[in-house]
């Protein structure tokens, strides 16, 4: 039996089948974010404090409370500010992962491509264009996290950071729209076609 969130995702046009939830990912760690820092992030990025929760010592990013999704500080610093734009929502749905599972460098690259396409073509890039311009990969240290890099010989944006230290333990929960995967996912079969 599917949850209400999974039923809504399945009905979204162009979405892939619901992916399998991850059990005990190796990246599971409690947050080190403090309430004072969370309040500062809310003010800095225009996030309503009523929409966020600071996880407790026994809470983890891969299993947020119902109606919430885990967000890390570096995502906001990269320009991916909740509730996200439609472009990011569709990319995450197509990849069948939760927002936290996309490495913060991926948000910097994707948001950079959004700005570039908007300014030059007056539109957002399609998923197919993103797959042509970027490579998606996982590494052995963090197999639940998806890395994004500019494809070799097709980098439109240069000198973006390739790493973001400490993002796994600086997260909070934010109320999420129904079309997000909240729990961490393995990813659908189509997802792995784009991985190197």
Q: Where are the regions that the model predicts?
A:
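Residue-register detector that marks a fixed positional context within folded domains
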Residues: 1-196
């Amino acid at each position: 039996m599917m949850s209400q969130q999974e039923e809504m995702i399945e009905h979204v046009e162009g979405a892939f089948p619901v992916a399998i939830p991850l059990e005990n990912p190796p990246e599971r760690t409690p947050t080190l974010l403090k309430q004072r820092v969370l309040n500062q992030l809310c003010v800095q990025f225009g996030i309503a404090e009523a929409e966020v929760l600071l996880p407790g010592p026994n809470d983890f990013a891969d299993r947020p409370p119902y109606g919430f999704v885990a967000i890390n500080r570096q995502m906001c610093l990269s320009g991916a500010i909740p509730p996200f734009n439609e472009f990011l929502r569709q990319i995450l749905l197509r990849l069948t992962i939760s927002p936290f599972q996309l490495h913060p460098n991926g948000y910097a690259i994707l948001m950079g491509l959004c700005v570039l396409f908007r300014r030059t073509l007056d539109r957002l890039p399609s998923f197919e264009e993103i797959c042509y311009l970027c490579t998606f990969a996982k590494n052995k240290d963090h197999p639940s996290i998806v890395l994004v890099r500019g494809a070799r010989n097709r980098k439109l944006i240069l000198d973006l950071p390739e790493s973001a230290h400490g993002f796994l333990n600086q997260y909070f929960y934010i109320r999420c729209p129904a079309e997000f995967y909240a729990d961490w996912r393995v990813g659908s079969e189509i997802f792995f076609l784009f991985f190197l």
